[in-house]
Amino acid sequence: MRNACTRARLTRTARAMVKTLFIAIASVTFFFTSDLALPQSAAAYPFWAQQTYPETPREPTGRIVCANCHLAAKPTEVEVPQSVLPDTVFKAVVKIPYDTSVQQVGADGSKVGLNVGAVLMLPEGFKIAPEDRIPEELKEEIGDVYFQPYGEDKDNIVIVGPLPGEQYQEIVFPVLSPNPANDKNIHFGKYSVHVGGNRGRGQVYPTGEKSNNNLYSAAATGTISKIAKQEGEDGSVKYLVDIKTESGEVVSDTIPAGPELIVSEGQAVTAGDALTNNPNVGGFGQLDAEIVLQDANRVGWLIAFVALVMLAQVMLVLKKKQVEKVQAAEMNF
């Protein structure tokens, strides 16, 4: 009887272990295959930089890490005030221009509209203004944009996106300036602002693999012996390009749906030659700006100084005219 109970417990324990192991394997499999199954989000959204580089999106060289996946260079603009007073709300405008008539390659190879994203690196102490501090007029300019801090303790670094590019080629950030009177770590002076903006999907995943929004090249030198189209159970399409080398070895290049093949069977190619066009129409751009946290007292003293200088000039002019009148009177006498 005791042996039977022991065997029953062992059986239940074994089943539980097998179930746990199965769940663990399924979770790991989903984690590593999600980038392949859903590549569009992996390449297009700024939060991938947040997950891959959790400390800061800016490398020691000054390069913003979004450029590691978005390889093409495109212009990005930013508008910030030259100076701001403490504890005030102002707007920073990031402009991500592009030709809205073009379309990008989607994850399934179809043509879709471009999306945009941005990262705004503000000085320490600056952050997105609370809802109750944003004027109604500024709220209308912002629209339905959601601002996400880069980390729990990184309110001064803000990421936005993905957003539909046709509606958000200009992204308005409502920024609240810090008050040195309340935080001794904040000081008046000039600070740097770093901005990055991308439009369209990236060419490389954070894992280093190419997306289907990229150019594909030959892996070997030889003659293209076969080009075969394959369709997966999920409807995905890919092409296998077989290259036969001089030694008789066959090297296969896998090309996902999206890039257009520019080679044909029987064509001789060299390793590195393009097999497809480059479908990318987007790109990333970054730039730096400066903003001054101005002391209101200094502004007041500056105004007083300017007023004093102007008053002194007026007095000098009046004194000069008075002297001229006296000299003229003496000459007449």
Swiss-Prot record:
The chain crosses the membrane at residues 299-318. It is a single-pass membrane protein. Keywords: Electron transport, Heme, Iron, Membrane, Metal-binding, Photosynthesis, Signal, Thylakoid, Transmembrane, Transmembrane helix, Transport. GO terms for molecular function: electron transfer activity; heme binding; iron ion binding. Its cofactor is heme. Heme binds at Y45, C66, C69, H70. It is found in: Cellular thylakoid membrane. Residues 1-44 form the signal peptide. Its main location: membrane. Gene3D superfamilies: 2.40.50.100, Cytochrome f large domain, Single helix bin. GO terms for cellular component: plasma membrane-derived thylakoid membrane. Binds 1 heme group covalently. Component of the cytochrome b6-f complex, which mediates electron transfer between photosystem II (PSII) and photosystem I (PSI), cyclic electron flow around PSI, and state transitions. The 4 large subunits of the cytochrome b6-f complex are cytochrome b6, subunit IV (17 kDa polypeptide, PetD), cytochrome f and the Rieske protein, while the 4 small subunits are PetG, PetL, PetM and PetN. The complex functions as a dimer. Belongs to the cytochrome f family. PANTHER family: CYTOCHROME F (PTHR33288:SF10), PTHR33288. NCBIfam families: PRK02693.1. This is Cytochrome f. The gene is petA.
